[in-house]
């Protein structure tokens, strides 16, 4: 006879554990448990049957997987928390006894822990760590710009700023930056590293106000994890580029505000590979050559990967030959003895390259003219021919003091501008190699009014606003500078992270400028209204011409009075947007505020009357459109009948999809109405 199953020993009751039970099992406080879960990546779970998981109770509870909590029991950081708890007791006891020397010794020997094993567990491969780098970079840049406070020491801010500078130095070195967008929240950057798109947000360099409702203990735990992760990633990236990590910091230049100039890239020689850690400083030309010289000979000549493969093949052949012949130490050539001079090495490289080249042989079913496969060598050649990384290489820039120098120096150098071709005002920091009166300057970046400012400098320089640099990067070409001159109204700054073609395909709103760039049909939202206005004007002109052709003076006087009255009437875009979309959320409130500011109570009463009439006509149009289109009603009826055949889950999903589509259409109509109102106000 089978054993009777007891309640609560299997199923959801066994697979899930509450948070209070987890605290008792681990014997730690709630704050330590939260910290441990953040570091290990464990988060609450929602069981399908809460009552079964909670053993019959319906009280609101937080659940975790039982296996996750058992996994935490063997965590070394958990033991470090317990050691720190014992350490705190000893320090408090020494302070209570006024044993200051003992308390100082205890504080100097406080228990420490490392997160290296957690990084290796959470990110088994390097690509996994790159995929999770977005939040890490955004958090580091955030803390690098936050002023130090009671809960955050100045050393933490300095460490975050150092990691951010090292990351930006790598991006500038490899020219992997691809997109930049200036938004209200900050500046969005995107770089492609090892085939992975990494996007991060950099706040503007304003004085940050620390919010009081943010739990900095949780934020500091995330920051601790991200600092360790960033150290691992940067070490791997610098090592792949044959650079020594961390780069050497010149403290004197750093104290003078030199920025990236205070970090010096060091190339790793052959002695580094053998463990002698010989370093040599290098300039930009040497940095460009360093990654290709990752393996060198003893005499300093370059040893390519093909040379290593060729020598391994020779050693393998000699070993096979030695199995059948008597052993002879002199017959085994050494690696250094087989190396020829530089000229013969180049010829051997060409031969080896030809031997290693992939040759596509025609199969029996396909002819010789079939398409060849794309190889890694072809992809590398295509990547090397991309002109975008060297977009600004032929120009010399000067950054004015009101422009954020660190941000635009990073953008310019990431797209080919040499450090010797980027200068800034001495107020922004030391290290500028271009003076304000340098004749070589081709682009002077300004972001302030130019009234009363002298713009006469030697040479042929162009004064531009900062948006020109970002728009050139997103357009992947050098744009004309006339629309970006100081004092000019800037063109729309479109986001490069939005696929406008896909948005247009799904029926979303696409700006007119984006449509022109994509070559789509110009969907001008003000065209219909303009045609109606023109027709009305033509009818009025015909009526006037038919009723009183002889009284031309009176007609001209009436037209002049109408023009003057129209000129005196203030523009009210919020009212026009409300009348175009009377059901739009927030439009009524904006129109009321606008009416109070322009005309007071009379304008407010007039607004409410117009809104009521517009709302009534809108409902009437909606009602007539449903009654006057039998084809649409038949389609709706067929849709409802098909909807009854769906399951409950599918029906809910279909309803949510319809609601999302309706919201998208409403948003598109609202934006089109806003665009229509703005275009009318711009008319002379």
Curated annotation (Swiss-Prot):
The keyword RNA-binding does not apply. InterPro entries: BRCT_dom, BRCT_dom_sf, PES. Residues 284-352, 508-580, 612-684 are annotated as: Disordered. Residues 342-352, 528-543 have a biased composition (Acidic residues). Its main location: nucleus. GO terms for molecular function: ribonucleoprotein complex binding; RNA binding. Residues 387-486 form the BRCT domain. GO terms for biological process: maturation of 5.8S rRNA from tricistronic rRNA transcript (SSU-rRNA, 5.8S rRNA, LSU-rRNA); maturation of LSU-rRNA from tricistronic rRNA transcript (SSU-rRNA, 5.8S rRNA, LSU-rRNA). Residues 285-294 have a biased composition (Low complexity). It comes from the Eukaryota. It is found in: Nucleus, Nucleolus; Nucleus, Nucleoplasm. One of its GO terms (cellular component) is preribosome, large subunit precursor. Component of the NOP7 complex, composed of ERB1, NOP7 and YTM1. The complex is held together by ERB1, which interacts with NOP7 via its N-terminal domain and with YTM1 via a high-affinity interaction between the seven-bladed beta-propeller domains of the 2 proteins. The NOP7 complex associates with the 66S pre-ribosome. Component of the NOP7 complex, which is required for maturation of the 25S and 5.8S ribosomal RNAs and formation of the 60S ribosome. This is Pescadillo homolog. It comes from Malassezia globosa (strain ATCC MYA-4612 / CBS 7966) (Dandruff-associated fungus).
């Amino acid at each position: 006879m089978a054993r009777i199953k007891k309640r609560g020993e299997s199923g959801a009751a066994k697979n899930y554990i509450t948070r209070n039970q987890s605290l008792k099992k681990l014997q730690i406080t709630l704050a330590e448990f939260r910290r441990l879960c953040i570091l290990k990546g464990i988060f609450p779970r929602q069981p399908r049957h809460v009552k079964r998981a909670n053993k019959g109770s319906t009280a609101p509870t937080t659940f975790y997987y039982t296996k996750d909590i058992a996994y935490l029991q063997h965590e070394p950081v958990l033991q470090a928390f317990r050691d720190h708890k014992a350490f705190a007791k000893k320090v408090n006891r020494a302070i209570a006894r006024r044993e200051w020397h003992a308390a100082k010794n205890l504080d100097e020997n406080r228990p420490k822990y490392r997160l290296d094993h957690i990084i290796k567990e959470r990110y088994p491969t390097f690509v996994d760590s790159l995929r999770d780098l977005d939040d890490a970079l955004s958090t580091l840049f955030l803390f690098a710009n936050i002023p130090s406070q009671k809960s955050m020491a100045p050393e933490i801010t300095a460490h975050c700023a150092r990691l951010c500078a090292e990351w930006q130095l790598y991006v500038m070195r490899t020219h992997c930056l691809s997109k930049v967008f200036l938004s209200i929240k900050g500046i969005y950057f995107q770089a492609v590293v090892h085939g992975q798109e990494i996007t991060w947000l950099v706040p503007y360099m304003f004085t940050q106000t620390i919010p009081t409702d943010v739990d900095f203990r949780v934020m500091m735990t995330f920051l601790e994890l991200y600092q360790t992760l960033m150290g691992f990633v940067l070490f791997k990236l610098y090592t792949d580029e044959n650079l020594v990590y961390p780069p050497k910091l010149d403290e004197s230049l750093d104290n003078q505000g030199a920025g990236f100039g205070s970090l010096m890239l060091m190339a790793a020689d052959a002695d580094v590979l053998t463990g002698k850690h010989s370093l040599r400083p290098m300039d930009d030309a040497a940095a460009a050559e360093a990654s290709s010289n990752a393996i060198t000979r003893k005499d300093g000549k370059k040893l390519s990967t093909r040379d290593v493969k060729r020598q391994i093949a020779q050693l393998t052949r000699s070993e096979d030959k030695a199995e059948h012949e008597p052993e002879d130490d002199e017959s085994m050539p050494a690696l250094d003895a087989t190396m020829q001079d530089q000229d013969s090495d180049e010829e051997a490289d060409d031969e080896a390259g030809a031997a290693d080249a992939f040759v596509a042989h025609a199969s029996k079913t396909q002819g010789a003219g079939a398409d060849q496969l794309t190889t890694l060598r072809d992809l590398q050649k295509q990547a090397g021919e991309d002109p975008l990384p060297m977009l600004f290489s032929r120009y010399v820039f000067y950054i004015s003091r009101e422009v954020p120098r660190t941000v635009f120096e990073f953008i310019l150098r990431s797209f080919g501008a040499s450090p010797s071709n980027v200068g800034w005002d001495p107020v922004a920091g030391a290290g500028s190699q271009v003076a304000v009166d340098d004749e070589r300057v081709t682009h002077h970046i300004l972001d302030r009014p130019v009234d009363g400012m002298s713009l006469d400098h030697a040479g042929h320089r162009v004064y531009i606003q900062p948006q020109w640099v970002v728009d050139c990067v997103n357009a992947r070409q050098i744009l004309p500078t006339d629309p970006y001159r100081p004092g000019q109204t800037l063109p729309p700054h479109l986001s490069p992270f939005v696929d406008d073609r896909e948005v247009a395909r799904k029926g979303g709103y696409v700006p007119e400028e984006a449509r022109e760039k994509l070559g789509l049909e110009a969907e001008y939202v003000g065209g219909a209204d303009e045609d109606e206005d023109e027709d009305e004007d033509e009818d009025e002109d015909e009526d006037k011409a038919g009723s009183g052709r002889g009284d031309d003076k009176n007609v001209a006087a009436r037209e002049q009075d109408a023009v003057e009255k129209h000129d005196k009437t203030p523009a009210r875009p919020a009212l026009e947007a409300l009348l175009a979309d009377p059901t739009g959320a927030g439009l009524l409130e904006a129109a009321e505020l606008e009416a109070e500011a322009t005309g007071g109570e009379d304008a407010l009463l007039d607004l409410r009357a117009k809104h009521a009439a517009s709302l009534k006509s809108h409902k009437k149009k909606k009602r007539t459109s449903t009654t006057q289109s039998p084809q649409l009603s038949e389609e709706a009826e067929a849709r409802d009948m098909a909807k009854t055949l769906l399951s409950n889950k599918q029906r809910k999903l279909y309803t949510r999809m319809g609601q999302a589509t309706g919201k998208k259409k409403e948003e598109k109509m609202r934006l089109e109405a806003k665009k229509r109102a703005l275009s009318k106000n711009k008319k002379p």
